[in-house]
Regions:
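Catalytic core of pol beta-like nucleotidyltransferases
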Residues: 1-31, 40-41, 56-105
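Generic leucine side-chain signal with a strong bias for well-ordered alpha-helical environments
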Residues: 24, 49-52
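A short, glycine/Asx- and small/polar-enriched loop/turn
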Residues: 43-48
């Protein structure tokens, strides 16, 4: 599904997008960026979904538990592995950043 949000780059693929976005909102995510093959519109049957998220205000343990729950729920919904992080090492970020897509939360 592709979104028509005016501030988003076209060409990304996020299976079950509306449901995934609701899971992220329910987990307290305030900002989410999709990166990797899904962000490039190159999703295959075996591709995972990669998210960089921000969850301001949550205590570290609570944030971790909310992320784990959201990750599990998205995996169950999409049938794909999900990688979710609150930060990336500088080298990985530099590689992923050009393809990142801001999701409309």
């Amino acid at each position: 599904m592709r979104t028509s949000h005016p501030n988003l780059r076209r060409g990304y693929t996020l299976p079950h997008e509306a449901e995934v976005l609701q899971i992220l909102r329910d987990a307290g995510v305030h900002r989410a960026r999709l990166f990797g093959s899904a962000a490039r519109g190159e999703l295959t049957e075996t591709s995972d979904l990669d998210f960089l998220v921000q969850m301001p205000g949550a205590a570290p343990f609570d944030e971790f538990m909310q992320m784990v729950d959201a990750q599990h729920r998205i995996e169950q919904l999409t049938g794909r592995s999900v990688d979710m992080a609150t930060q990336l090492r500088p080298g990985i970020y530099a590689e992923a950043e050009p393809d990142m897509v801001e999701l409309p939360l």
